[in-house]
Amino acid sequence: MKIMVFQQNGSAESKVEGIRRFGRDLCELKMISIDVPLPPVLDEGDAYLPARIDADLVLDHLKHPDLALDLAHLCAQSGIPMISSGKKIREPGVTCPPTCCGLSRNSAHGIYGSRFGAPELTVQTDGKKITGVQVKRGAPCGGTWQAAGRIIGYPIDQAAVRLGLEIQYCCTADPSDWDPIYGKSPVHFAGHVHRRAMETALAVSH
């Protein structure tokens, strides 16, 4: 699967590192970095974007809202799905989850979407403590895998809360970005979805 990642000043580096590490070579990544200074209002965003996108999926990590919107237009015209976490873009084929780990399953996202997005876990216990955790689907930054390894040995009744706390230490999102719809910062949202994933996994294991 060909994935094109757009970033500004290293804004996607942690995600790309996680995808390469935990994607099991399922994805072919191409980076487009736009590191030049941009004006507050961008009228000619096309000048900074490729004329044609050769990809099955686009990941938008651009910081400039006008540039991200122009990229969304380009993807919509080309019929290429785009994931733009934390933004409010309304274009056909554009998905805007609150965080990268808030992405729901969508067949349009192909192999990437089956491996990365809202966390899905399986767990093993000895009746009292967590003895094993497998990540079936997790955050592209890799935080799900990191945090899951840290709760081995925790009491079952503390595991969900602990995972939520651990992921907040790993999360690379900006904690100052408050989402009025969800009533949480991206970091707190990440903690919430991981806690719920562990609760679901524990319910299934019993």
Where are these regions (language model features)?
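Rossmann-fold NAD(P)-binding glycine/threonine-rich loop
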Residues: L69-A76, P81-N106
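Glycine-rich adenosine-cofactor-binding loop
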Residues: M1-R20
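N-terminal glycine-rich "phosphate-gripper" loop used for MgATP/nucleotide binding
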Residues: D56-L71
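Glycine-rich, highly charged phosphate/nucleotide-binding loops
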Residues: I34-I53
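Structured beta-strand/loop patches that form or line metal/cofactor-binding pockets in enzymes
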Residues: T95-G127
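Active-site- and interface-proximal helix/loop "cap" or "latch" segments in soluble metabolic
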Residues: G113-E120, K129-H206
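NAD(P)-binding Rossmann-fold cofactor-contacting core
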Residues: E13-S14, R21-P40
